[in-house]
């Protein structure tokens, strides 16, 4: 089947860069698949690729989707028959089989009261800051989110559990990788094909959580 491209004209008042972005977005095969497959975001395909590679999700597991809005990753996970808790400071529309909690993940004491002694098999984080257009600053901001996600994992991840977190490549990602190496038996970088080639976005996957006995 021939792909039909959508042409976008530069509207009055619209910057050329915006027109180029819109053209790329409308002709993105994953955006088109998102509409066809009824996923809430194209990032759903990133989790599908990560899961195919690392076999993260298994029926009956309990997982947490951090920064879940708009819900693409939670959709994918719920289709695997896992029990999903989606956490975000933004509201998320109802997804069948997903329990949504509106919290800031930095409010650990509140979350500890909520979850008590509950632990999870997989913790996912596709969190990213709103881009300011300056790569070095965006990198710093996403690494702060990575640290918040890892701190959550220290409290709530089961021994032997799995952890996935989005990073932007930069001067600090290697330090974060080394931090994960102390806590997981296996740590891998992974860039899904559905991640745009020009993006510095990658994922770090930690397999086999060793212990939460270190200071938290």
UniProtKB/Swiss-Prot annotation:
GO terms for cellular component: cytoplasm. The keyword Chloroplast does not apply. Its EC number is 2.1.1.166. It is found in: Cytoplasm. It comes from the Bacteria. GO terms for molecular function: rRNA (uridine-2'-O-)-methyltransferase activity. The active site is at 166 (proton acceptor). It catalyses: uridine(2552) in 23S rRNA + S-adenosyl-L-methionine = 2'-O-methyluridine(2552) in 23S rRNA + S-adenosyl-L-homocysteine + H(+). Belongs to the class I-like SAM-binding methyltransferase superfamily. RNA methyltransferase RlmE family. PANTHER family: RIBOSOMAL RNA METHYLTRANSFERASE, RRNA METHYLTRANSFERASE 2, MITOCHONDRIAL. This is Ribosomal RNA large subunit methyltransferase E. It comes from Wolbachia sp. subsp. Brugia malayi (strain TRS).
């Amino acid at each position: 089947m021939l792909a039909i491209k959508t042409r976008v004209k530069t509207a009055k008042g619209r910057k050329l860069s915006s027109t180029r972005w819109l053209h790329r977005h409308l002709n993105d095969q994953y955006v088109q698949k998102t509409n066809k497959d009824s996923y809430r975001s194209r990032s759903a395909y990133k989790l599908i690729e990560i899961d195919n590679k690392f076999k993260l999700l298994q029926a009956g597991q309990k997982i947490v989707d951090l920064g879940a809005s708009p819900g693409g990753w939670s959709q994918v996970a719920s289709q695997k028959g896992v029990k999903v808790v989606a956490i975000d400071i933004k509201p998320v529309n109802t997804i069948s089989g997903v329990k949504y909690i509106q919290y800031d993940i930095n409010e650990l004491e509140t979350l500890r009261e909520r979850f008590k002694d509950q632990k999870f098999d997989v913790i996912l984080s596709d969190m990213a800051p709103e881009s300011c257009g300056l790569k070095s600053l965006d990198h710093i901001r996403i690494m702060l989110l990575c640290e918040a996600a890892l701190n959550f994992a220290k409290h709530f991840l089961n021994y032997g559990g799995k952890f996935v977190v989005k990073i932007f490549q930069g001067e600090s990602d290697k330090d974060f990788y080394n931090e994960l190496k102390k806590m997981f038996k296996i740590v891998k970088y992974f860039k899904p094909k559905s991640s745009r080639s020009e993006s510095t976005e990658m994922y770090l996957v930690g397999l086999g959580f060793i212990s939460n006995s270190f200071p938290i």
